[in-house]
Amino acid sequence: MKVLNNLLLFVFLIFLVGSNVVNSTSQTWINQDVQRSIDVTTHLSKESISIKAKSLTDKNDIYQISFNSKYHVSIQALDSQNNELKVYLSPNSINIKEGFKTYNIELKNKVKKDEIVQLKVKVTSMIEQMIPYPSEIKQGQTQLVLYLNNHYFTSPYKTETQKTTVKLASSKVESYSEEQPTSLKGMTVTYGPYSAIEAFSVSPMRIHYENGSPFFVLTNLLKEYEVSHWGNLAVETHYQLENKGAHLVGAFSRLDYQRNPSVNPNQIAEVNEAVPLSATDFYYRDSIGNISTSSYQYLANRINFKIQPRFPLMGGWKNTFYTGYNLPIEKFLSVDTLTGQYHLNVTFGVGIDNVYVENHILKVVLPEGATDIKVHAPFAFTQSEENRKTYLDTIGRPVVVINIKDTASENYRYIQVTYNLSSLSIFHEPLLVIGAVFTLCIFIILYSRFDLSISKSKQI
């Protein structure tokens, strides 16, 4: 009996601590008004949230936002001046509310009590929210998608007023949930306005509609930059692509596809990637070899690199390939004249619209001898280092490895890698080549002066 009482006391204390965490969080801000605009015209849910919040405490510099723990999201936060704010998973996220992940948005300045803050949060998600329903279709059939969300803005704070608009891919809506007031006009579903919503209020949203967009997912993406102070910046990207839309059931007819390719809009027939205007020496290969069905088109501010796989990717199909090109090093690498430190500015991600990446790895191969390596990025990441030996290397080149889970095309942003490199390290490889050539010349000269014959020929 005593053991049971102790157990009940322990459970009560856990509940009390959890309640205190929620209460302390909800008493720091109040949402005066929230406007949510959700775009589900593709396979991604792109949510733009405008928040007007009032601080309830003094010296407040952390605003929190929560999401269903089942959803994998990519978050970007901006202040009223469009300055990007730091977003990271709250250290005590699991203790705030069960079933939710809570993220901290770090404000630029501390906020006084009763001061109003306006934020804009962009959220991109796909996993668990966009479900092909039915999960299997025949060639030529229309793909239907079930979209799941919350009628209310999921927040650890109370919300005075809020409204949500959902833009669909089609006006063909099979069904949709209703939390009055609710209206459907054409391709837009409007929920609200709602008033006096408590923290972590949940009302399941469910919209079943026609969406022919292919579920373009990169299960693994490896992008590699190789820096050469004597050459260029080589870029190579490895893709593991999968169409996670409604799976194709039955046989695939190439004849029907060639006759009318638009019948199956949920297929992936080509991939268009935006690359810098200065890119040259393009190549595109898969496990079989070079693929000639690729092209590039010069536009005003970029090159459109068009990649056409050997076959269209229907629902449930996968493909792997890699591409590459070269960039002039002087446009991406600069040196601080005061400190001698090198600054490399490159993009994280790939310039492909409406792409979702489950596992994203970026590698930066620096010159041999690089030291004091640091990475600066506007988002959280995990970092590790490798060593790679290639031509003319002695100790190997340092490789910076950056890894992020669940990213979207919105993560196509610049990161900076800084490092130091001595003059000896810069001239290391040219000196090796010069030394090798000089040694070879000396050897040839000495060899030509030695007489290695067994007997000297007699002169007549």
Swiss-Prot record:
UniProt xrefs under InterPro entries: Ribophorin_I
Pfam family, one: Ribophorin_I
Gene Ontology annotations for the cellular component aspect, listed alphabetically: oligosaccharyltransferase complex
TM regions (residue ranges): 426-446
Induction (record text): Upon infection by L.pneumophila.
Residues carrying a glycan: N23, N290, N345, N420
Stretches of the chain found on the membrane's Lumenal side: 25-425
Highest taxon above the source species: Eukaryota
Swiss-Prot/TrEMBL keywords: Endoplasmic reticulum, Glycoprotein, Membrane, Signal, Transmembrane, Transmembrane helix
Major localization class: endoplasmic reticulum
Topological domains annotated Cytoplasmic: 447-460
Bilayer topology: Single-pass type I membrane protein
Assembly: Component of the oligosaccharyltransferase (OST) complex.
Function: Subunit of the oligosaccharyl transferase (OST) complex that catalyzes the initial transfer of a defined glycan (Glc(3)Man(9)GlcNAc(2) in eukaryotes) from the lipid carrier dolichol-pyrophosphate to an asparagine residue within an Asn-X-Ser/Thr consensus motif in nascent polypeptide chains, the first step in protein N-glycosylation. N-glycosylation occurs cotranslationally and the complex associates with the Sec61 complex at the channel-forming translocon complex that mediates protein translocation across the endoplasmic reticulum (ER). All subunits are required for a maximal enzyme activity.
UniProt record similarity statement: Belongs to the OST1 family.
Protein name: Dolichyl-diphosphooligosaccharide--protein glycosyltransferase subunit 1
Organism field: Dictyostelium discoideum (Social amoeba)
Designated gene of the protein: ost1
